[in-house]
């Protein structure tokens, strides 16, 4: 019996051996081949290798080159290979039932791609434990088949082949999942396998962990519109912001748009994501970020979060960085080659083995330079520039650009009062940076009062349902508004400037922050594009400084916005404490119903976070003690923003204190003395007047708060001027002053505008207070026209001598050629004095010159002088009044005489006559209030031109008072000229002034007719001395300035003493006028000396003997001509008129 089992086994083996020879060779061979094939997959790993070598890829539906597996094994060692060999997706034997999934024809056919409506991926993982059980079962079934064949004498091979059929479903475990699902698979050998379902554009993949994150192992395509289609350049399936119904994602291609204008664009994306009531800066930053992403990555993406979509696609060729990288391939390769060569020479020449650290440093430098300059090729043997891991767009740019907002947001959210504190966790991940700019917009809107309406509604609606403290007037009106309203009503520009100084500074610093951030982002982009040029310089010691400077600038532009934000938070915090004390803010997230009304009832999904002062004084989390409550209630901001609540709380507390107290046996006066309120309601000395003590305390608190705020404003204003340099010094970078708006730019512009408005208002008030231009009369009647005889009207120095243009003729000795000139609207009194010519004596019957010789100064022969010397002072004072009127709004004349300026007016008739033209170019004054004055001056100049024309015609026709005395025959031309002149005299446009006593002048006139040429100079000098004595006996006004050389010649000098203009901008003009007058005096003195000595161009033509005095005078005059103070005009063609 003991030998029975052994005997049975021997019999079975012998029977199997005998029957084996009866089977056909072909049948046995096929069966054995099947068994060998199956036994080659004794484990899941060996089976995976076999499938990889003999069949198509079973682990994925998307074929990839073998080199990809090698790279992925480096990124995810062990894990990737283990998952790769066990994963099954493309296997029709598995996925043909309800358990694994029924996919006729296999999972990878186009018809069986993943439905985007239900993006579920089915896959299976091989399990070694179940595989061992399956193989043991096959061995047992084979043994039974052999025993059966021995006993029955049949063929066992069919049963054996059936026993060894590859029953994959027995040792594969089915899985399914959607993007984001993950799990673990437990097995023998390598016990745990981690898997996760991820979506990569139009593919859903099974991934495992690696050094760089989730590494895809096997993938399957989704249905249309995927894969690559006409919409792929602007589609992003992962973006659900613009999809109303996520279940209907693939049905409408335009619903997938996230970067195009069809989705609202960058502005709409930022606006919808913002949570502040007044959106100002976040759309600007979002549009800048999208522009940078398109510039650096591809035009098909609008965020660095989508960089993986185009890493291996040809759409990257539109990137500026990519194009520069392609151009730098050979140069970077040359740098790396030189580095390898130098390192090899170093090893050969060192004579000893270098430490291992140098080898490690060598390898790390090579990897670093390649990764950040041109990218590492992830497909060995593939020369495509698209299959590269680029460190700049995958790591550097996202870190730097997100870091700018990240660092600044840390500081911005550190507000002690809780005002405008936005948590970036409440935003979508792609727009979390908007929390920083929402905080900035919120603060600017709060300090400028732009959120008054929204805060009013929300605060009253959510006031802890305490309607006893309901205050309809409670809103966040900034304190400056309470100064601005009375300032505008009163018209006090100083008060307006004080009220607007803080909001202007807030706007200016906020604008600088936005501008500085954008400039830092642009600078980082520029430096990043140049990375292929600067990063290879890291290899060599000689060029290392260039790389260090490049990195230092990158870090500086990263940190500078944080410094600016720190300054802003400090400024805002001090301001909050100065105006609001220890008040704390609460926030409420509401739906923007106001926005819906503005959009005509449209729906809006944007929620707004509103901040208002917490008036729940029992909230110990924000008001831990009574001092904090009193600090808030007594603050200026709270009292101004909550006037009714403040009064109500004050009255309630006072009355409650009295009611709750029991007098007992205390006398009434002592009982009432216990209450501070009652003891304070007595009149007491205030700061400026008698007032109740309680009211005085409130006024004192308000004034102290204002002083604190002004002092804070002063400190912040001065510090802000150096903010850009301070930020640059802290970060050792470049200051942004030259490329960004300065922190005080808007503040100074606003203050300048207020100053200009104040000056304009002041100028209008002055004109109105004078009663208009018509009131500026000399007291003789006739309005403005009465003043023409006394003053010019074209500018501060457009004063015409009595002998010229609009005044009566003057008398000099008989001359051969009388110099009569027309007046220019832009000439001055010194011109009249300088144009005096004393020609040699001539017969009394000399005729008057032709009209071509007319100039401002009139020199005509006359036996009598028609100037009334007693009225000189009155004439000068009248002209002073008119000149002051014109000076207010007229710019200073140019110092250069007779230059070639376009406005210069040159009288060609004066050439060759020895008359010097001193016409100065006057420009329009910048004060707009002078427009009316300038228009009236133009009317005066028109009247003057009319007077000059009439007088010139009168003189040219042989008329005038001098000719009347000579008894000449009156021609028709002379008659008409006299008629026209008399009409002007009768209408009051011009006034003739005559001198009473002419005996001295007549005496010298007769002597001058009898003297010869050699004695005339001496006689003229004596005549001037006599006239000096006569003029000294006449009382003149303090402003009168008389030229001694012109006395007796009929020329009156109208020089005026200019007073300080009320407009401070006119001080410079007055100073320049004074310098011009000094130059004129110098010119007049030299010219008068030249004429008195017998010199001048007219005398030179006579060939007289040159005296020492004349030589000195000529020398002085020539020096003035050479220095450009005066320009002498000559015309040789008119010498015959001299």
From Swiss-Prot:
InterPro entries: Conjugal_tfr_TrbL/VirB6. It is a multi-pass membrane protein. Residues 854-869 have a biased composition (Polar residues). GO terms for cellular component: plasma membrane. The keyword Glycosyltransferase does not apply. Residues 775-784 have a biased composition (Gly residues). Residues 875-888, 961-977, 995-1032, 1058-1071 have a biased composition (Basic and acidic residues). The keyword Membrane applies. Pfam families: TrbL (PF04610). Keywords: Cell membrane, Membrane, Signal, Transmembrane, Transmembrane helix. Residues 838-852 have a biased composition (Pro residues). The chain crosses the membrane at residues 331-351, 359-379, 392-412, 494-514, 520-540, 554-574, 699-719. Belongs to the TrbL/VirB6 family. This is Uncharacterized protein RF_0089.
């Amino acid at each position: 019996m003991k030998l029975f089992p052994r005997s049975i086994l021997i019999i079975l083996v012998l029977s199997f051996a005998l029957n084996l020879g009866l089977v056909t060779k072909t049948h046995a061979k096929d069966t054995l081949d099947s068994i060998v094939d199956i036994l080659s997959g004794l484990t899941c790993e060996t089976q995976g290798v076999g499938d990889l070598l003999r069949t198509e890829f079973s682990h994925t539906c998307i074929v990839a080159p073998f080199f990809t597996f090698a790279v992925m094994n480096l990124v995810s060692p062990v894990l990737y290979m283990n998952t790769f060999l066990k994963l099954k997706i493309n296997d029709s034997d598995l996925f043909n039932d309800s358990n694994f999934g029924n996919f006729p024809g296999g999972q990878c056919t186009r018809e069986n791609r993943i439905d985007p409506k239900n993006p579920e991926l089915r896959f299976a993982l091989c399990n070694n434990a179940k595989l061992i059980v399956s193989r043991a079962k096959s061995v047992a079934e084979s043994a039974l088949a052999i025993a059966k064949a021995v006993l029955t004498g049949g063929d066992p091979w069919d049963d054996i082949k059936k026993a060894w059929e590859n029953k994959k479903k027995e040792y594969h475990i089915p899985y399914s999942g959607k993007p984001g699902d993950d799990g673990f698979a437990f097995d023998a050998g390598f016990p745990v396998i981690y898997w996760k379902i991820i979506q990569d554009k139009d593919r859903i993949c099974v991934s495992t962990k690696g050094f760089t994150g989730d590494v895809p192992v096997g993938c399957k395509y989704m249905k249309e519109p995927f894969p690559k289609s006409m919409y792929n350049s602007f589609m992003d399936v992962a973006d659900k912001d613009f999809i109303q119904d996520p279940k209907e994602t693939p049905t409408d291609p335009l619903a997938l748009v996230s970067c195009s204008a069809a989705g609202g664009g960058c502005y709409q994306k930022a606006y919808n994501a913002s949570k502040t009531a007044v959106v100002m800066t976040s759309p600007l930053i979002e549009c800048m970020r999208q522009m940078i992403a398109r510039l650096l990555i591809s035009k098909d993406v609008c965020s660095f979060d989508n960089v993986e979509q185009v890493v291996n696609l040809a759409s990257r060729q539109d990137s500026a960085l990519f194009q520069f990288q392609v151009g730098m391939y050979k140069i970077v390769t040359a740098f790396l080659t030189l580095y390898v060569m130098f390192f090899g020479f170093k090893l050969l020449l060192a004579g000893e083995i270098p430490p291992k650290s140098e080898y490690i440093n060598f390898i790390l430098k090579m990897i670093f330079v390649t990764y950040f300059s041109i990218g590492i090729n992830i497909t060995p043997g593939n020369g495509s520039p698209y299959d590269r891991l680029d460190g700049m767009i995958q790591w550097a740019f996202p870190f730097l650009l997100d870091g700018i907002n990240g660092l600044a947001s840390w500081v911005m959210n550190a507000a002690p009062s809780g005002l405008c504190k936005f948590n970036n966790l409440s935003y979508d991940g792609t727009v979390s940076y908007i929390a920083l700019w929402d905080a900035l917009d919120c603060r600017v809107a709060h300090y400028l009062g732009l959120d008054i309406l929204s805060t009013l509604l929300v605060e009253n609606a959510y006031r802890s349902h305490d309607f006893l403290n309901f205050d309809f007037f409670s809103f966040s009106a900034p304190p400056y508004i309470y100064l601005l309203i009375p300032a505008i009503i009163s018209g006090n520009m100083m008060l307006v400037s004080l009220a607007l100084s803080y909001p202007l500074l807030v706007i200016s610093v906020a604008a600088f922050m936005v501008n500085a951030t954008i400039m830092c982002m642009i600078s980082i982009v520029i430096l990043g594009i140049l990375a292929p040029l600067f990063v290879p310089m890291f290899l060599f010691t000689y060029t290392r400084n260039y790389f260090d400077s490049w990195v230092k600038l990158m870090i500086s532009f990263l940190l500078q916005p944080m410094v600016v934000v720190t300054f802003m938070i400090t400024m805002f915090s001090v301001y909050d404490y100065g105006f609001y004390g220890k008040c704390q803010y609460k926030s409420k997230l509401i739906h923007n119903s106001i926005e819906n009304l503005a959009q005509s009832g449209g729906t809006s999904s944007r929620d707004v976070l509103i901040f208002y002062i917490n008036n729940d004084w029992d909230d110990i989390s924000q008001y831990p003690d009574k001092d904090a409550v009193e600090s808030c209630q007594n603050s200026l901001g709270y009292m101004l923003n909550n006037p009714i609540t403040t009064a109500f709380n004050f009255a309630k507390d006072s009355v409650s204190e009295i009611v709750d107290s029991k007098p007992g046996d205390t006398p009434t006066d002592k009982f009432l003395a216990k209450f501070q309120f009652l003891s304070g309601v007595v009149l007491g000395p205030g700061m400026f007047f008698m007032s109740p003590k309680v009211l005085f305390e409130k006024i004192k608190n308000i004034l102290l708060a204002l002083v604190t705020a002004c002092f804070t404003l002063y400190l912040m204003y001065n510090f802000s001027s150096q903010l850009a340099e301070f930020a640059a010094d802290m970060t050792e970078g470049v200051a942004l002053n030259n490329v960004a708006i300065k922190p005080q730019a808007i503040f100074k512009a606003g203050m300048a505008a207020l100053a200009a408005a104040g000056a304009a208002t002041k100028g209008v008030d002055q004109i109105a207070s004078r009663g208009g231009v018509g009131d500026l009369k000399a007291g003789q009647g006739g309005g403005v026209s009465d003043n023409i005889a006394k003053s010019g009207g074209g500018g501060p120095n457009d004063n015409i001598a009595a002998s010229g243009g609009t005044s009566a003729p003057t008398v000099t000795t008989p001359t051969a050629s009388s110099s009569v000139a027309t007046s220019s609207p832009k000439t001055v009194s010194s011109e009249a004095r300088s144009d005096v010519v004393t020609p040699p004596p001539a017969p009394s019957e000399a005729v008057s010159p032709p009209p071509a010789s007319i100039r401002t100064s009139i020199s005509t022969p006359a036996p009598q002088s028609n100037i009334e010397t007693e009225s000189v002072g009155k004439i000068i004072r009248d002209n002073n009044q008119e000149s002051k009127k014109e000076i207010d709004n007229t710019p200073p004349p140019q110092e250069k005489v007779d230059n070639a300026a376009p406005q210069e007016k040159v009288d060609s008739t004066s050439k060759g006559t020895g008359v010097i033209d001193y016409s100065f170019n006057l420009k329009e004054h910048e004060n707009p209030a002078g427009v009316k004055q300038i228009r009236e001056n133009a009317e005066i100049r028109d009247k003057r031109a009319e007077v000059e024309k009439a007088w010139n015609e009168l003189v040219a026709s042989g008329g005038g008072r001098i000719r009347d005395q000579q008894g000449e025959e009156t021609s028709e031309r002379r008659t008409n000229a006299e008629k026209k002149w008399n009409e002007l005299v009768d209408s009051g446009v011009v006034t003739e002034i005559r001198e009473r006593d002419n005996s001295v002048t007549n005496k010298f006139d007769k002597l001058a007719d009898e003297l010869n040429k050699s004695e005339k100079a001496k006689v003229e000098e004596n005549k001037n001395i006599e006239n000096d004595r006569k003029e000294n006996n006449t009382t003149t006004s303090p402003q009168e300035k008389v030229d001694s050389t012109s006395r007796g010649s009929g020329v009156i000098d109208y020089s005026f003493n200019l007073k300080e203009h009320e407009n401070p901008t006119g001080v410079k003009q007055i100073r320049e006028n004074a310098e011009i007058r000094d130059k004129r005096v110098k010119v007049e003195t030299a010219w008068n000396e030249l004429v008195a000595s017998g010199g001048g161009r007219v005398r030179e033509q006579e060939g007289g003997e040159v005296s020492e005095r004349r030589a000195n005078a000529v020398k002085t005059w020539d020096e003035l001509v050479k220095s450009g103070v005066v320009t002498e005009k000559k015309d040789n063609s008119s010498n015959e008129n001299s």
